[in-house]
Amino acid sequence: MASKITIFFVLALVVVCTMMVCIPTATAELVLPCKTTYDCVNLPCLGRPPLCINGQCKCTTTLTHQAKLDNLRTMNDAKTCKYTSDCDPRMRYSCVSGSYICLNGFCTCT
């Protein structure tokens, strides 16, 4: 009977020690070979455009030239300003780039 209790405690000790050990996890990254950017259209980039860089498909975070121009357009209800400090600091959340300036008397996303 004592041997069964001993085995139970040893087994419980092994289980507790196993649960305390941190097992490192690896983050997986999808690597697709490519020759042109067209080869990367199936890469899941969550709204970011994929590009072929050094023979591998990569998700980019850069804005296109047109997106930057669209972001520069002032809104009809844009606040007037003399200095950038006159603009509402919460405006950065509505700008794609996250930054703004006082341009030609209006608070404008950059």
From Swiss-Prot:
Annotated signal sequence range: 1-28
Where it sits in the cell: the answer is: Secreted
Q: Which GO terms describe its biological process?
A: defense response to fungus; killing of cells of another organism
Supply the alphabetized keyword list.
Antimicrobial, Disulfide bond, Fungicide, Plant defense, Secreted, Signal
Gene Ontology cellular-component terms listed: extracellular region
The disulfide bonds in this chain are C34-C52, C40-C57, C45-C59, C81-C102, C87-C107, C95-C109
Where does this protein chiefly localize? Answer: secreted
Report the family membership: Belongs to the DEFL family.
Please identify the protein, giving its name as recorded: Defensin-like protein 296
Taxonomic lineage is: Eukaryota, Viridiplantae, Streptophyta, Embryophyta, Tracheophyta
